[in-house]
Amino acid sequence: MASHIIGNRNSTPDASKSSLRPPSSSRNLGSHQLRASADMSGFPSPLSSRSIRPSSEVYYSQQSQAQNNAEDPLDRAAQQWLADIDQYETTLEEMAAATLDQDFKDELSAIEQWFRVLSEAERTAALYALLQQTTQVQIRFFIQVLQQMAKSHPMSGLLSPANFSEKDAMSNRLNDAMSKLNIDSSRNSLGRPPPSPGAKRNSGLDSSTINAMFPDAAAAIAKKKAEFTQQTGNAPPSNRNSAVYGDRSSLVAPTISAPDNTDNLGQPPASPWAQRGNEPQPPIARPKSSSGQQPMGQFSQASSGLRSPLPTQTATITAPEIEAPLLSPYNVGNASWASMTNTPMTATFGQQVHQPPNSQADMVANATAMKLAALSTVNNRIALDDARKYRRARSNDGQGRSSNTNVNQTIQGGLASPGLPGANHLVAGQLLNAQQLAALQAQQQAAMAGRRSRPTSPGIAMQGGALAAMGFTSPQNNGFLAAYDPNNPLLGNGLGALGLSQFGLGGHEGYLSDHSEVTRGRSPRGRRGSSKPPEDPTDPNLLKDIPSWLRSLRLHKYTDNLKDLKWTELIELDDKALEERGVNALGARNKMLKVFEQVKEAKSEGKLDSIA
């Protein structure tokens, strides 16, 4: 066997005993050059690295993927535009629902009345301070509304033309880029999921009602819809009954400076834009609310690098601490100088009582239960503590402490709104609950009933029990004229509790209130609603001095209008003449004409012959 192999080592193997070992190339090059030249085993196969799919399919797949990547910004722009429109309508509808709340309407009316008395600079400062608390969504919403208001203003054509943004080069480039998208035959293929029942709005408000309540905001949203329809050829979906993509909770619009962040957006359907070649893509005409670069002539907003958006607010409420209420509108974390109302004359906030935790357990539990109950009845609205509880102390109360009484004047909830039980109160060292405090309040109100002509202002619904020890009363019991009431414990003999009457501080000067001397048995000087004048208008001594005569009639505000006339000329004036003299109030004119008739009767009877 071995000899046979050795003998055939340099020749072709036998057909019956072929070797499985391939011939060496070094042997074949010498004796079998023809066969060596035809042997292809030493060369790699050109099909060895070929994949399963043909190369054409791989090439076109890569090209298609590149096109899809190029069209992602267009997809995101369309989603951003629709999300903005949906967010604006959501904000507008929530505003309308909040405006219909009676409590909010009362609070808003009080704010508007306060705002009307401010100067232009104070209004600007107040608005600027409030804008610092806005979120990115609110900022974009206000930008659209303010632009609409500016265009509807009659002076906008002179200061800033309404169509200025459509004339600059940047807007022309963006509009041209968007107009190319309208040529696609598949522009109407934007698929959307069916309406989500969980995303429906349940406000029950008609769109016409909302538009009538906020015309400028509704016009701004309608303009955004018209722009979307004009640029894409598709009318935006009616998001009063469905969301744009998936559930409404996923439509949290990203920040302006980071439009590529799509983590908060639901998965959109297929791209509405058809695939095109790999030519350079022009920038898409994105809506102004989501564009990082504003056109010329328009206000730009700060990027997220300068001001980060506010943290997301949740409705999770824990038991608040007494020294730092979590639900206070004047929370330290969000406080600003505009949150402190007007300039205080005394300490802005009194020091709160630090009680042992065991005595505060029921207070914390009751307060937490009330807040959770309010949250369960008001949808998506966080019930804050009453802002009036944090108002500054009144100047005439000082710090609200007396040196000779063991009374704690820092009563928590002493300024709570009527109808809502406030926190427990410390009165004369005892902790009173809501029922005991209500009984004490009723007793104090019954004691003051003889000196009140109308109910106490709801601004101060609770009398501090500690004030009773000094005989103090609320300055609002008698309206704004309470300071002139001699029965007011703050003046007159009421200062005896403070030991100041010996210094002659018991007197007063000027005009008395409606119920000034009722309790002393004297006739009231000009009670409102009575037709009898406060003093005899036919007194010759008063008629000699017109300013004093008008002062006795409580008409001294018209002294400058009538002081140049004699009494004989004054009583001859009629209603028209009084109005020409500047007596614009109808009640004042009627009162004057009635007194003029009395003076004329006294003159005809001869009572005024001594000064005629």
From Swiss-Prot:
Signal peptide: none
Main localisation: cytoplasm
Comp. bias (Low complexity): 16-31, 44-56
Domain named SAM: residues: 541-602
Swiss-Prot/TrEMBL keywords: Cytoplasm, Nucleotide-binding, Protein transport, RNA-binding, Transport
Lineage: superkingdom: Eukaryota
InterPro entries, A to Z: SAM, SAM/pointed_sf, SMAUG/VTS1_RNA-bind, VTS1_SAM
Cellular location(s): Cytoplasm, Cytosol; Cytoplasm, P-body
Gene Ontology CC: one annotated term: cytosol
Disulphide-bridged cysteine pairs: none
Compositionally biased spans, kind Basic and acidic residues: 511-520
Region of interest (Disordered), residue spans: 1-74, 184-209, 253-311, 391-411, 511-544
Segments of skewed composition (Polar residues): 58-70, 288-311, 396-411
Biological process terms in GO annotation: nuclear-transcribed mRNA poly(A) tail shortening; protein transport
GO-annotated molecular function: mRNA binding; nucleotide binding
Alphabetical list of CDD domains matching this protein: SAM_VTS1_fungal
Subunit architecture: Monomer. Binds to RNA.
Family in the record: Belongs to the VTS1 family.
Protein role: RNA-binding protein involved in post-transcriptional regulation through transcript degradation.
Protein's UniProt name: RNA-binding protein vts1
Organism annotation: Aspergillus fumigatus (strain ATCC MYA-4609 / CBS 101355 / FGSC A1100 / Af293)
Gene that encodes it: vts1
